[in-house]
């Protein structure tokens, strides 16, 4: 155990068993930066070095993802290969090991529910034992398993994948979308996260970017990004609230906009509340009604449940614009009496009754955010709605009742976050110069102290980047090391908060208790990610810190996942090359056979037979296309094309000579006729 550096020890922290630290406040407050200093650091942080190439803004969403780039002073949302501006955050693995991302993955979910991953953002940076993960296990058809580091991972066909990997596959799709538009490699990115994400979740998101091959310049909060999208072209000063209810998370942020400075005053939220919960609530209602009417329980039938899940999502969306919808699922299941069909009418009022508790859960965080920002609802000049769930009329009414004003629909709820990320990318690249973003840390940071109490060092809603230091000392004679448990959260007891890591300070020179002065510095960067360092004030030497992470991906894990992602990218490239070669070959076969039929009278029979043999060989090659390379198929197709061109060239020459022959004989007959007429 270590004690405070002051003569009178104010309190002991940690337990004797853990040899924990003891801390004391300095007379002038924490040995760190003042609030004004935070602002200076924040401003300086945006004076980035020159960044080469475009910076893409990516909204890595729970349900859908979106990518945008800056074009001049405007952000442009990009369409994917399917022509859509948003991409489902769905990844699937087929029986033959093929990986599908986006809409192709979503389309086959009904027939492959156990190996189709959706809403995995809810697992990112979480431990397997987290209550939210245990709840999710009961609701999804795919397997969520405990990884060797205790984190929650997913399993498909016996292979384990971290949620960061699944996120990386989606990011690779977004990267590809950007590259197709830009015409060159996209390397730099700004990725958004829910404002209420903790350090582990932010780090795991950054890892996902690294695995996908992106250089993540900044991780920014989704509501803040939406505020940038809203306020970029606004000149008036005002306080705004951003109410962000997306597919998996809920955030509320209060911001003050003044002459291009976007300062977050407070943020709050719930990282396990969103559209997925609305879908799940409606699914449970449908399954319950179906059992009441037919006596059949669908809960053990994953394929039927996936159909109901998709129908529930569709009904939810329809009820935002209609007061009633029909849910029709023919041949949903069957029992001894035959097939069972689902036919149900659902009104908007019924749906609102089913999800009313979920909507109510957004109220307390909003009230807390206003309280932390020290503003009343009359001070808020605009309420911005972000996230697909804010299209629901009941949600809009709740927001209006809460803030006392009709919410603004000035931004597209699906695209605003990606647009804001692209604007932030423009700021970092130096293309956008009149914008400054001052964000905050959403959760308090501190250490475990005596009796398991959580002692805060950096309070929530502190402007970031920020740095605060505290001096510790030993609590026993001759003590050479001490363990510090760093936590993040708002609960009074450390055990109820998120354990970020256990930091063991070693190599402390043996001395009487209270003599060594070890300055431990807690630093939160502009991404909201926590760093910890320690220094012996007596010698000026940096002390060695052994970090025992409470989970997350190691450097080796990330390197392996990068290699796997590159392997998948190479496989995708080879597959695309093979598909293009097969299409080319089939086109050549079709054209050759058509021309052979058209010119059969002009072609030598033996040459035709040779060409037919070539076509047969080509068809045999295509029959085993999955084991052939695209290059082999392309070469064989080119050979067939050359052979057919030579043959048809012969046919054309023969036809031309026949035409000339018939033309000259016809001219002779005309001359004879003319002679006869003259006579």
UniProtKB/Swiss-Prot annotation:
The modification N6-succinyllysine is found at residues 135, 138, 206, 300, 368, 394, 567, 600, 610, 646. Residues 432-441 are annotated as: Interdomain linker. The lineage of its organism: Eukaryota, Metazoa, Chordata, Craniata, Vertebrata. Interacts strongly with the intermediate form of FXN and weakly with its mature form. Interacts with HSCB. Associates with the mitochondrial contact site and cristae organizing system (MICOS) complex, composed of at least MICOS10/MIC10, CHCHD3/MIC19, CHCHD6/MIC25, APOOL/MIC27, IMMT/MIC60, APOO/MIC23/MIC26 and QIL1/MIC13. This complex was also known under the names MINOS or MitOS complex. The MICOS complex associates with mitochondrial outer membrane proteins SAMM50, MTX1, MTX2 and DNAJC11, mitochondrial inner membrane protein TMEM11 and with HSPA9. The modification Phosphothreonine is found at residue 87. Residues 1-46 form a transit peptide. Residues 432-679 are annotated as: Interaction with FXN and ISCU. HAMAP family: DnaK. Keywords: Acetylation, ATP-binding, Chaperone, Cytoplasm, Hydrolase, Methylation, Mitochondrion, Nucleotide-binding, Nucleus, Phosphoprotein, Transit peptide. PANTHER family: HEAT SHOCK PROTEIN 70KDA. It comes from the Eukaryota. GO terms for cellular component: cytoplasm; mitochondrial matrix; mitochondrial nucleoid; mitochondrion; nucleolus. Belongs to the heat shock protein 70 family. Its main location: mitochondrion. The N-terminal nucleotide binding domain (NBD) is responsible for binding and hydrolyzing ATP. The C-terminal substrate-binding domain (SBD) binds to the client/substrate proteins. The two domains are allosterically coupled so that, when ATP is bound to the NBD, the SBD binds relatively weakly to clients. When ADP is bound in the NBD, a conformational change enhances the affinity of the SBD for client proteins. Residues 63-431 are annotated as: Nucleotide-binding domain (NBD). It is found in: Mitochondrion; Nucleus, Nucleolus; Cytoplasm; Mitochondrion matrix. It comes from Bos taurus. This is Stress-70 protein, mitochondrial. CDD domains: ASKHA_NBD_HSP70_HSPA9.
């Amino acid at each position: 155990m270590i004690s405070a550096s002051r003569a009178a020890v104010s309190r002991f922290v940690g337990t004797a068993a853990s040899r924990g630290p003891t801390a004391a406040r300095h007379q002038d407050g924490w040995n760190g930066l003042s609030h004004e200093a935070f602002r200076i650091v924040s401003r300086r942080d945006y004076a980035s070095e020159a960044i080469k190439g475009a910076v893409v803004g990516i909204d890595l969403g729970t349900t859908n993802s979106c990518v945008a780039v800056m074009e001049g002073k405007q952000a442009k949302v990009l369409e994917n290969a399917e022509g859509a501006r948003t991409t489902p955050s769905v990844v699937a693995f087929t029986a033959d090991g093929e990986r599908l991302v986006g809409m192709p993955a979503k389309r086959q979910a009904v027939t492959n529910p156990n190996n189709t991953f959706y809403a995995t953002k809810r697992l990112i940076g979480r431990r397997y034992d987290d209550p939210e993960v245990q709840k999710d296990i009961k609701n999804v058809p795919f397997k969520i398993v405990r990884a060797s580091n205790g984190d929650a991972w997913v399993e498909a066909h016996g292979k384990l994948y971290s949620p960061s990997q699944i996120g990386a596959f989606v990011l690779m799709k977004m990267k590809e979308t950007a590259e197709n538009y830009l015409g060159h490699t996209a390397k730099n990115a700004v990725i958004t996260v829910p404002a209420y994400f903790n350090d582990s979740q932010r780090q795991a998101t950054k890892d996902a970017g690294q695995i996908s091959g992106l250089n993540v310049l900044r991780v920014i909060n989704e509501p803040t990004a939406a505020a940038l999208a809203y306020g970029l072209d606004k000149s008036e000063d005002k306080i705004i609230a951003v109410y962000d209810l997306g597919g998996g998370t809920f955030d509320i942020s209060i911001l003050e906009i003044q002459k291009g400075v976007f300062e977050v005053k407070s943020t709050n939220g719930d990282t396990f509340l969103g559209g997925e919960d609305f879908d799940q609530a409606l699914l449970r209602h449908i399954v319950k009604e179906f059992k009441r009417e037919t006596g059949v329980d669908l809960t053990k039938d994953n394929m039927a449940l996936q159909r109901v899940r998709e129908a529930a999502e569709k009904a939810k969306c329809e009820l935002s614009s209609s007061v009633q919808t029909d849910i029709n699922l023919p041949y949903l299941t069957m029992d001894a009496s035959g097939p069972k069909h689902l036919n149900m009418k659902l009104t908007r009022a019924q749906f609102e009754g089913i999800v009313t508790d979920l909507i109510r859960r957004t109220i307390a965080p909003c009230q807390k955010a206003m309280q932390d920002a020290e503003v009343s609802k009359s001070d808020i000049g605009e309420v911005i709605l972000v996230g697909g769930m804010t299209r629901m009329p009941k949600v809009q009414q709740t927001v209006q009742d809460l803030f006392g004003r009709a919410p603004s629909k000035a931004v597209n709820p699906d695209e605003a976050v990606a647009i804001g990320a692209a604007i932030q990318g423009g700021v970092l690249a130096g293309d956008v110069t009149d914008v400054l973003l001052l964000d905050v840390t959403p959760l308090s940071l501190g250490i475990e102290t005596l009796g398991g109490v959580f002692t805060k060092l950096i309070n929530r809603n502190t402007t970031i980047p920020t740095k605060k230091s505290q001096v510790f000392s030993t609590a026993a004679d001759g003590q050479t090391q001490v363990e510090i448990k760093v936590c993040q959260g708002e609960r009074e007891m450390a055990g109820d908060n998120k354990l970020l890591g256990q930091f063991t300070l070693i190599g402390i020179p043996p001395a009487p208790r209270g003599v060594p002065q070890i300055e431990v510095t807690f630093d939160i960067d502009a991404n909201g990610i926590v760093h910890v360092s320690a220094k012996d004030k007596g010698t000026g030497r940096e002390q060695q810190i052994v970090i025992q992470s409470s989970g997350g991906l190691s450097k080796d894990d990330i390197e392996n996942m990068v290699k796997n992602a590159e392997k998948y990218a190479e496989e995708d490239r080879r597959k695309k090359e093979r598909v293009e070669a097969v299409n080319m070959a089939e086109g050549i076969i079709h054209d050759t056979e058509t021309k052979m039929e058209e010119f059969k009278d002009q072609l030598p029979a033996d040459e035709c037979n040779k060409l037919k043999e070539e076509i047969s060989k080509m068809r045999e090659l295509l029959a085993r296309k999955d084991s052939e390379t695209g290059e082999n198929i392309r070469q064989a197709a080119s050979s067939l094309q050359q052979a057919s061109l030579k043959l048809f060239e012969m046919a054309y020459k023969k036809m031309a000579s026949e035409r000339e022959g018939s033309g000259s004989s016809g001219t002779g007959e005309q001359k004879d006729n003319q002679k006869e007429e003259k006579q």
